[in-house]
């Protein structure tokens, strides 16, 4: 009920697992959460703020003005927020990120 969607963990048929080059969550009030995380000293980023059909390089296709054709893509683009993830991120720092998000979303 906090409006938070975490990445889905899946295992490939060969036993492989995701390595998370980016750890992207979806949250309803993304911009507000991003500002509050930044204020708390926690890095975050919106890597893909626009859907493909909204990007200038595809404007000649005529889809940039009709978001209702892609409501799920538009929703995801408006909610996606990438959190810090890198090999040197300690478990304590991971815990701090998770606890801060939990506190900010309550």
Language-model features, listed with the residues they occupy:
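PLP-dependent aminotransferase class I/II
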Residues: 1-106
């Amino acid at each position: 009920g906090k409006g938070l969607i975490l990445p889905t963990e899946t295992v490939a048929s060969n036993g492989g697992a995701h390595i998370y080059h980016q750890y992207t969550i979806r949250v309803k009030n993304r911009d507000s959460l991003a500002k509050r995380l930044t204020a708390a000293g926690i890095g975050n980023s919106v890597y893909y703020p626009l859907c493909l059909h909204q990007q200038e390089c595809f404007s000649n296709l005529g889809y940039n003005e009709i978001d209702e054709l892609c409501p799920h893509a538009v929703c995801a683009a408006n909610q996606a927020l990438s959190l810090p993830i890198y090999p040197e991120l300690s478990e304590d720092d991971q815990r701090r990120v998770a606890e801060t998000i939990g506190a900010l979303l309550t």
